[in-house]
């Protein structure tokens, strides 16, 4: 199954990611985003970081998740290659913290990769942020589909 594809968006860049589960679609969206930054074949899994994101909605969780990964790249130069989801809570039905708009959607993952090295890693796009513009996280037939636009 195709994991993701790049969307042609005027002035920005978009991504459509797929997965048999919503968790797999989130992982594939992150992999697709990293592939927009550099060629992942050159990235080695030398180091791991734990990345956590929360939101009150599944759409918001995706944006928070991708922006947290962008933060690690912008701040530490960390580019991920392997992603293992340790915890994924995609619903708003958690008691009691899920009541009253609390952040009840959550993802926690171990991301393996290394610091970006311009001598070894091809620089493609500088992604500023994942946006809510045309954002979509939905189940279609036998798979989950994600559409996300990145500010560049």
What are these regions (language model features)?
Residues 2-90, 103-152:
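N-terminal intrinsically disordered, cationic/polar leader segments
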Residues 95-101:
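Glycine-biased, low-complexity coil/linker segments
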């Amino acid at each position: 199954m195709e994991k993701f594809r790049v969307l042609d968006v005027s002035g920005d860049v978009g991504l459509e990611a797929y997965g048999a589960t919503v968790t797999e679609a989130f992982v594939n969206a992150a992999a697709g985003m990293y592939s927009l930054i550099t060629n992942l074949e050159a990235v080695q899994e030398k180091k791991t970081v734990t990345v956590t994101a929360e939101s009150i909605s599944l759409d918001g969780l995706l944006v928070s998740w991708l922006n947290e990964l962008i933060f690690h790249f912008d701040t530490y130069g960390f580019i991920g290659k392997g992603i293992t989801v340790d915890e994924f809570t995609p619903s708003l039905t958690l008691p009691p913290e899920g009541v009253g708009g609390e952040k009840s959607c959550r993802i926690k993952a171990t991301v393996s990769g290394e610091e970006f090295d311009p001598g070894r890693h091809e620089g493609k796009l500088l992604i500023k942020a994942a946006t809510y513009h045309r954002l979509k996280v939905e189940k279609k037939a036998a798979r989950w589909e994600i559409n996300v636009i990145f500010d560049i």
